[in-house]
Amino acid sequence: MSARNTNSRKDVIVVGAGPVGLSAALALRSCGLEVTVLEADPANRVRPGSRALFVHRESLALLDRASPGLAPAIAGFGVMWRTKRTLLGGREVYARTYPELPPGRIPPFTSLRQLDTERFLLEAAKVAGADFVWGARVTAVEAGPDEVLLTTEDGATHRACYVVAADGSRSTVRRSLGIAMNGPRSEGFHTTVDIAEDPDDPMPLERTFHYEHPGLGWRHVMRVPFAGGFQIDVQSADGDRPEEFATEEAVRDWLPRVVPRKYVDSVTCVANYRFLQVVAESFADDSRRVLLAGEAAHLFPPLGARGMNSGIADADAAANAIALALSAADPRQAGAAVERFDATRRAAAEANRDAAGTALAHLRPRRRITRLRQRAAAALSPVVPAFGEWLEQATYGPKTPRPHAGRY
């Protein structure tokens, strides 16, 4: 390795203090390992928008295992809507209301802004003893047979036995290692609008998906509640331009067609994005010292809320693999632990990508017959409820639990 090493070697360095990096830090500390988190942003960073909303039950269970009490804290802050409703062309085709959960049980999910999830994770990681270096943007990575050397923008170097790369979709770590991302980019774009709820006169706590909304030119529109507000997601039509939907002026024009006009003055964030369906060709480097997690390893449509939840599963699996590697009797066993992580989590990511891609193909059909089937299902749903349920479930993609990798 380079002679530029200036710091004592750590067990593990996590690059990135988003939800995946923080989850990795928690899991590593629960394994008894020292961990330092390098984050490019300053400690007082402000994160725009709601970003990832849903923390699912399996993720809550993983977090609670690493930090007992964390699951009820996050779930208690977030909201769980009990009613989901699906419409097509202005007519309801499916609705279901779930019973109240028994006290003390982890909910199927909780909905809150990513910045709120991160706040809980950061506090738990600090209490657990993770060290943080803020304003430490990684610019170079050297991985060798015995350690990894990271160089940050200020010229400082950091050495570790293992590194978890959780530095997001533009991962410097992944790019430095030459690991490619493979997969397609979807057509069109989506516009999301975060809105603060009116505490005196709130909308029903329901998730609604509206195929072909008549008030918005027959575009698909979804409303998802989160703690303190809700998000509107609009799917673009062919020929749409982002400036027609994702500017302040545009939102003020179209938003009253889908929610009461009073919410025009309660918009907190507007964004537009395109869907990628890509997975890293490997979740570990050739030396088996760097493990990729979260968006550093995969990007796919958020249909089914697979993004952050799969990243939390990556983080937990990476921590377990590193703990096994550090306690291994010889380098071959250590490498095998990382290889198992690579194979298992890459297979999970590919399954998630395919499931989200199936949902996206349903929502953006290339063949007219698919749209006709959806409309026929809507017409028949009053007499055959299964058709309405199909329209509801298809927006998430298939649920295919993997016995060795969990749901995500």
Feature locations, PLM:
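A conserved short coil-to-beta-strand element within the FAD-binding core of flavoproteins
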Residues: W134-V148
